[in-house]
A protein has these predicted regions:
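Conserved catalytic/switch belt of AAA+ P-loop NTPases
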Residues: 228, 261-285, 293-303
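Conserved RecA-like P-loop NTPase ATPase core
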Residues: 165, 187, 209, 223, ...
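Conserved post-Walker A coupling segment in P-loop NTPases
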Residues: 168-233, 243-259, 287, 324-329, ...
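C-terminal boundary/linker segments immediately following FHA domains
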Residues: 2-21, 58, 91-104, 108-158
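Dynamic helix-loop-helix/coil hinge segments at AAA+ ATPase domain boundaries and subdomain interfaces
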Residues: 143-167, 217, 363, 417
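Intrinsically disordered, low-complexity acidic Ser/Thr-rich regulatory segments
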Residues: 1-80, 90
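Bacterial C-terminal helix-turn-helix
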Residues: 1-23, 27-28, 36, 43-44, ...
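Nucleotide-binding/hydrolysis machinery
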Residues: 91, 197-204, 279-289, 297-404, ...
Length: 467
């Protein structure tokens, strides 16, 4: 079978937007993603579809195999910190019940350890088994398969909804359609645009323009170019960035910040593929694919008179949402690997303490992938000791404030604690009373980093008023 038609691709995008609004039916089985192992970043993330599964077991073994027997799935981990009987997921209508099967190190759900014999129903959660993190999602909407990064062989995403978006976007890019990428700041819209350019097969380069970075008169010259003598200082012809993207892709980042006067000229380029340089009387034909990106609500800008309705209708017809990082936690393993490949030590030379990796997986990432990148690269530099030695990233190396790194505290009555955690909780409460609520002093007494103690207080439901 060939690729879907343009009409079928458009229907796919419309269906996805309906699903995101909650009106579309769940069209995929639940998924369980092995996100990342703290001790071995070279292990690739993997996704398991739980189609027809009534029970899922995760346990330690040598093979690292996956076995399906009837309605039961067994995932075997080569993780020495997991137990030979560890995690059980049991289907319960539209959710799964999580149980620990008597493991040595326990099982945690969203950073909270399960008590003995506790049965916790969840739909979407981060699960800890030994030193390996999983992400459970049920129900799932979107596509089973995602495009791969041709440079690494890794999938671009393990999130079903984002998989659907990228698959449709790739088909449209190969047919030279103009596209609009939407999403919060830092979600990776430019990364998506560069991938779309690579898969489009266009022979020219990708030229990126930040529409918010330049004042109006400079932006016009940058985009459209000028002829010699067009204005004072124009000593020679300049083709401009639109023409520089000939047979390639023009990325207009932050298009919502483009001045109104330039929007009319841009519309002419998009509709007729012709550009008139400053000081010129003739229009020059151009062959460019236009990808725009914005973190703004363009329809709201239209209502305010700050964005042209006709430009939105033309460029915004094929709108591709890039989800925030907090909505696709199953991608954190892929992104961590992608970012840390850039450091000299490589993936083989870096591992994480569990508290640090747990913080990364549970953090809400308000600044998205851009923030993750900043945090990881800074953590590597802070954790680096001697040349050639392995890097071990702990929570003290993560440049996140305590309020960012720790989840909100819960009441003790809402938490089921193991005997070990009960002892630890009592000790921290006693130390807080002894040191009059000084967390730094408690951290010194426990020989732990202050940020780790703050996270323990949140996990164990300790409020300062208890002291």
């Amino acid at each position: 079978m060939g690729e879907p038609s343009d009409e079928e691709t458009l229907d796919t995008l419309k269906s996805e937007r309906s699903s995101q609004r909650g009106s579309g039916p769940p069209d995929l089985p639940p998924s369980l993603v092995k996100v990342v192992c703290a001790d071995d970043l070279q292990q690739s993330p993997s996704r398991h579809w739980l189609e027809g599964c009534e029970e899922v077991r995760v346990l330690r073994g040598r093979s690292g195999a996956v076995r399906q027997e009837g309605h039961s799935l067994t995932i075997v981990l080569a993780d020495r910190y997991a137990s030979v009987r560890h995690l059980l997921l049991r289907r319960a209508q539209d959710a799964f019940v999580v149980l620990d099967e008597g493991s040595t190190n326990g099982t945690s759900v969203d950073g909270r350890r399960l008590a003995a014999a506790e049965e916790r129903p969840v739909q979407t959660a981060v699960l800890e088994v030994g030193h390996t993190f999983f992400h459970l999602r049920t129900p799932a909407r979107g596509a089973r398969d995602a495009p791969t990064d041709e440079r690494t062989g890794d999938p671009l995403t393990l999130n079903p909804e984002f998989s659907l978006t990228l698959s449709a976007a790739g088909r449209l890019a190969r047919r030279a359609h103009d596209l609009l990428l939407t999403g919060e700041s830092g979600v990776g819209k430019e990364v998506v645009a560069r991938w779309l350019h690579r898969v489009s097969g266009r022979q020219g380069t990708l030229v990126a323009v930040n529409c918010a970075a330049l004042p109006e008169h400079l932006l016009e010259d940058e985009l459209f170019g000028h002829l010699k003598g067009a204005f004072s200082g124009a000593h020679s012809d300049r083709p401009g960035l639109i023409r520089a993207a000939e047979q390639g892709t023009l990325l207009l980042d932050e298009i919502g910040d483009m001045p109104l006067s330039l929007q009319a000229k841009l519309l002419r380029v998009i509709e007729d593929r012709r550009v008139r340089p400053l000081g010129g009387e003739r229009e020059v034909p151009v062959d460019v694919q236009v990808i725009a990106a914005t973190n703004r609500d363009l329809q709201a800008l239209v209502a305010e008179g700050r964005f042209r309705q006709d430009l939105l209708a033309r460029q915004g017809l094929l709108r591709l949402p890039v989800p925030p990082l907090r909505a696709r936690r199953e991608d954190l393993g892929l992104l961590i690997r992608q970012i840390l490949r850039e450091v000299p030590e490589g993936l083989a030379g870096i591992r994480f303490e569990m508290d640090a990796l747990r913080t990364l997986l549970l953090h809400d990432w308000p600044l998205n992938v851009r923030e993750l990148r900043r945090v990881l690269l800074a953590a590597v530099d802070l954790a680096r000791t001697e040349e050639g030695k392995a890097i071990v990233i702990g929570p003290q190396h993560l440049p996140l404030t305590a309020s960012e790194a720790a989840p909100p505290p819960r009441r003790a009555a809402d938490i089921s604690l193991s005997a070990e955690d009960q002892v630890l909780r009592t000790r921290i409460v006693e130390l807080l009373a002894e040191h009059r609520g000084n967390v730094a002093a408690v951290a010194r007494a426990l020989a732990r980093p202050r940020t780790q103690v703050q996270r323990l207080m949140a996990r164990l439901g300790i409020q300062r008023r208890e002291t």
